[in-house]
Amino acid sequence: MIETDRLIAPTAKEREDQLDRAVRPKVLADYVGQPAVREQMEIFICAAKKRREALDHTLVFGPPGLGKTTLANIIANEMGVSLKSTSGPVLEKAGDLAAMLTNLEAGDVLFIDEIHRLSPVVEEILYPAMEDFQLDIMIGEGPAARSIKLDLPPFTLVGATTRAGLLTSPLRDRFGIVQRLEFYNVKDLTHIVARSAALLGVSMEELGAAEIAKRSRGTPRIANRLLRRVRDFAEVKGDGRITSELADKALNMLNVDERGFDHMDRRLLLAMINNFDGGPVGVESLAAAISEDRGTIEDVIEPYLIQQGFMARTPRGRVLTTNAYLHFGLSMPKRLQESQGGEGIA
């Protein structure tokens, strides 16, 4: 199973970006959560507008689904300029980037998603464009080839990535503003769900919003996706109003439990409990036990379980923590309690 098959996958599904546009905040005043990011960006944007300058180039990084694209749109709206969007894999040749840069107006925002996936050739073109607002273009071929410089209007590059560690130092150093987006707490997600419900014309109780929020894995994209599915359930099985009880029934039917775990998460945890006595166990053995490939376990299932403190990586392999046993109403084996007391968790 691939990640986008999962209801609680943080990556966008096909057509989901179009649906999310209806509920995305357009200005900082409507931006919920990330208080430090919101406060800083408000100051930076206000200062740039007072000086009548383009905002400094901005790098936004963090796990998928937390609102990097939303923040880029807000920056453009607050600055009163146009937003041009693309992504790292799309910009295959230097000419692709040059075409976008030469179409920018003064102050415009160029948003590059997955910027860590830019090819080295394209990245080289970006350096002088970011630093000096100049574009170096080669004209002709062979001995007759020559380089010419084109002046570009001042613009703001907003780069987004889920893998900040893969950015090269020269590229990372050219961003004047760097913002990390964190997972959202239940209170902020409840606010987001309630706001989205109002925009979609869905009748909802506050406790219904909270029920969806606490199962959304700290991710607004998942929260909005669950809201749409619970809305379907409310219209067919209820009177259209989302209550706490109805949301609980709908999400249980969708196999999303109170911690935001789905069947893949639970299958892995139960396999470790029943087949490997809680670990330690190697990832290859675990993959064979649940009939998934190693990459799916490492990249799709494991990260959230580790982040929530249900699993740990040790030098000897994966082990479950007390939280995993408590989740299923089980007692942790004494052997594991003793070993975790003296073994380093990586």
UniProtKB/Swiss-Prot annotation:
CDD domains xrefs: AAA
Catalytic activity: ATP + H2O = ADP + phosphate + H(+)
Example of a GO biological process term: DNA recombination
Annotated localization: Cytoplasm
Record: residues binding Mg(2+): 69
GO MF annotations, alphabetized: ATP binding; ATP hydrolysis activity; four-way junction DNA binding; four-way junction helicase activity
One of the record's GO cellular component terms: Holliday junction resolvase complex
Endpoints of the signal sequence: none
Keywords associated with the record: ATP-binding, Cytoplasm, DNA damage, DNA recombination, DNA repair, DNA-binding, Hydrolase, Nucleotide-binding
Residue ranges of the region described as Small ATPAse domain (RuvB-S): 185-255
Annotated stretches, region: Large ATPase domain (RuvB-L): 4-184
Region annotation Head domain (RuvB-H): where it falls in the sequence: 258-346
Residues involved in DNA binding: 294, 313, 318
Pfam families for the chain: AAA_lid_4, RuvB_C, RuvB_N
Chain positions recorded as ATP binding sites: 24, 65, 68-70, 131-133, 174, 184, 221
Family: Belongs to the RuvB family.
Subunit structure, as described in the record: Homohexamer. Forms an RuvA(8)-RuvB(12)-Holliday junction (HJ) complex. HJ DNA is sandwiched between 2 RuvA tetramers; dsDNA enters through RuvA and exits via RuvB. An RuvB hexamer assembles on each DNA strand where it exits the tetramer. Each RuvB hexamer is contacted by two RuvA subunits (via domain III) on 2 adjacent RuvB subunits; this complex drives branch migration. In the full resolvosome a probable DNA-RuvA(4)-RuvB(12)-RuvC(2) complex forms which resolves the HJ.
Annotated NCBIfam families: PRK00080.1, ruvB
Function: The RuvA-RuvB-RuvC complex processes Holliday junction (HJ) DNA during genetic recombination and DNA repair, while the RuvA-RuvB complex plays an important role in the rescue of blocked DNA replication forks via replication fork reversal (RFR). RuvA specifically binds to HJ cruciform DNA, conferring on it an open structure. The RuvB hexamer acts as an ATP-dependent pump, pulling dsDNA into and through the RuvAB complex. RuvB forms 2 homohexamers on either side of HJ DNA bound by 1 or 2 RuvA tetramers; 4 subunits per hexamer contact DNA at a time.
Protein name: Holliday junction branch migration complex subunit RuvB
Gene source species: Cellvibrio japonicus (strain Ueda107)
